[in-house]
Amino acid sequence: MLLSDRDIRAEIDAGRLGIDPFEDSLVQPSSVDVRLDTLFRVFNNTRYTHIDPAKQQDELTSLVEPSPGEPFVLHPGEFVLGSTLETCTLPDDLAGRLEGKSSLGRLGLLTHSTAGFIDPGFSGHITLELSNVANLPITLWPGMKIGQLCLLRLTSPAEHPYGSAKVGSKYQGQRGPTPSRSYQNFIKLS
């Protein structure tokens, strides 16, 4: 079941759902707007000949931060990682779904490639997979509304929520745009 604005506010007021910093004006009829943080991860295209999800490639990306008051410019065809300004903490009976903003999608900005799902129990900044599919550069301003977080109530609390020892939650507590850690659970078939 998708939470309404009144349910979202009730979860926040009860201290079960954490969105920090929180502004009530960001609550929409069935979502909460999230804003863009100041940090970005850009790909170092000259460090590797290819991306291998089975290997740890620490120098694949570099962390960059625009000067205060300046935007990050995302050029056509480029892909970078960003993150939400807000730290989001979900209880064990709520899952999240990050969606893009329609107004930004109409400009050619994709907010996530595939990873828009947030497990119950997750706590941290949500990493954004930002792509420009337009024909012109797009300026990304830290603090701008970048997406909307929809919240779904589970039929029962998760037995092993994200962050529990059994799950192997490699992104729990992440701060800023976090690079892929796919190598930590990659299994090659023989």
Curated annotation (Swiss-Prot):
CDD domains: trimeric_dUTPase. Bifunctional enzyme that catalyzes both the deamination of dCTP to dUTP and the hydrolysis of dUTP to dUMP without releasing the toxic dUTP intermediate. The active site is at E129. Keywords: Hydrolase, Nucleotide metabolism, Nucleotide-binding. Belongs to the dCTP deaminase family. It is an enzyme of class 3 (hydrolase). Pathway: Pyrimidine metabolism; dUMP biosynthesis; dUMP from dCTP: step 1/1. This is dCTP deaminase, dUMP-forming. InterPro entries: dCTP_deaminase, dUTPase-like_sf, dUTPase_trimeric. It comes from the Bacteria. DCTP binds at K101, S102, S103, L104, G105, R106, D119, T127, L128, E129, Q148, Y162, Q174. The record marks G116, F117 as: Important for bifunctional activity. One of its GO terms (biological process) is nucleobase-containing small molecule interconversion. Homotrimer. Residues 162-184 are annotated as: Disordered. GO terms for molecular function: dCTP deaminase (dUMP-forming) activity; dCTP deaminase activity; nucleotide binding. It catalyses: dCTP + 2 H2O = dUMP + NH4(+) + diphosphate. Its EC number is 3.5.4.30. Gene3D superfamilies: 2.70.40.10. Residues 171-184 have a biased composition (Polar residues).
